[in-house]
């Protein structure tokens, strides 16, 4: 991870060399004020994300203890679900059989 070299204080205290045709000091100061504001926001955001990351890591380490109970409950379908599925399949097969008799039975007669 990259190290942050600047702090809002370092940016504020930065001195620039002046020359005959140097930069406008007020313009540089205004820009640095904006940089300091943004930098302060970034620091707060990083702290917030680090706290959230720590909470999620703590939650992830405690989650495996509760996960096996959930996994075993969902890994085996219940007998009621299996019975309903087979009853539905049986009904579908009966309907298909009746439809085939209707369609193909009439064709044989004609």
Curated annotation (Swiss-Prot):
Quaternary assembly: Forms polymers through the coiled coil domains. Interacts with PBP1, MreC and EzrA.
Family, as annotated: Belongs to the GpsB family.
InterPro entries tied to this protein: Cell_cycle_GpsB (IPR011229), DivIVA_domain (IPR019933), DivIVA_fam (IPR007793)
Function per UniProt: Divisome component that associates with the complex late in its assembly, after the Z-ring is formed, and is dependent on DivIC and PBP2B for its recruitment to the divisome. Together with EzrA, is a key component of the system that regulates PBP1 localization during cell cycle progression. Its main role could be the removal of PBP1 from the cell pole after pole maturation is completed. Also contributes to the recruitment of PBP1 to the division complex. Not essential for septum formation.
Native organism: Streptococcus thermophilus (strain ATCC BAA-250 / LMG 18311)
Keyword terms of this UniProt record: Cell cycle, Cell division, Cell shape, Coiled coil, Cytoplasm
Positions of the UniProt region annotated as Disordered: 59-79
Residue runs in coiled coils: 37-63
GO biological process assignments: cell division; regulation of cell shape
A GO term from the CC aspect: cytoplasm
Disulfide bonds: none
Main location: cytoplasm
Protein name: Cell cycle protein GpsB
Residue stretches of biased makeup (Low complexity): 60-75
Subcellular location per the Swiss-Prot or TrEMBL entry: Cytoplasm
Biological classification of the source: Bacteria, Bacillati, Bacillota, Bacilli, Lactobacillales
């Amino acid at each position: 991870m990259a190290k942050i070299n600047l702090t809002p204080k370092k940016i504020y205290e930065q001195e620039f060399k002046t020359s005959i045709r140097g930069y406008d000091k007020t313009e540089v100061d205004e820009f640095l004020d904006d940089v300091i504001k943004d930098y302060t926001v970034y620091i707060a955001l990083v702290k917030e994300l680090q706290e959230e990351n720590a909470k999620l890591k703590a939650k992830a380490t405690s989650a495996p203890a509760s996960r096996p109970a959930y996994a075993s409950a969902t890994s085996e379908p219940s007998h009621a679900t299996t019975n309903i599925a087979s009853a539905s399949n049986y009904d579908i097969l009966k309907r298909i059989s009746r439809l085939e008799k209707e369609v193909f039975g009439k064709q044989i007669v004609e």
